[in-house]
Amino acid sequence: VEVRIIFDDFGNLTRLHDETLQQIQNAGIEVEVFNPVHRYVNRIYFNYRDHRKIAVIDGYYAYTGGINIADEYANLIVRFGHWKDTAILLRGEAVQSFTLMFLQMWNLTEKEPRWDEALLPSPPVEAEGYVMPYCDCPLDDYKVGESVYMDILNRAKDYVHIMTPYLILDNEMETALKFAAQRGVDVKLILPGIPDKKAAYALAKSHYQYLTAAGV
């Protein structure tokens, strides 16, 4: 079985030891490090991080969500109390979109990009509704993720419920959240009570007063 892993270097600087990485590679697993941290790297590029969590299996199944590969996610260690996270399982043609997302990142450093052999056909499944996975990256000129959220907030008629570990808003996004609540949409946000990033937690709290005053 071909097993490939991409991980972001910044998030593993102090937690992934060279010996562990070597054991993974010795087991026949291919590994790519996204945007390795180097003191000579331009600070703008240093901020280009890959925060996506994607697992694709044989073209049949795709998992995505907030779950990393780390001991606290398996409750082997306790860092911030009981660790709760969410992921979803997808089947059908949407799986190919996740395969392409993975290959796009993998092939950034490949001299001979591999596409076709990994794009296995995804058997169709019967389902109500429509699933359209999307992604964005620092190389894009268009902010896909932000645009999707803005469209959801501007079109919503009944409710918008969002669960996120980090609430980092620009003025446009904060205004969209407040405006949706003010026109009668039930807007609810769920955030961690115990932060893993204190700076991000403080930044999120700076928005609370303005959001709650608008009815969020």
Listing of model-derived features with the role each one plays in the protein:
Residues 1-216:
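Charged, low-complexity intrinsically disordered terminal segments
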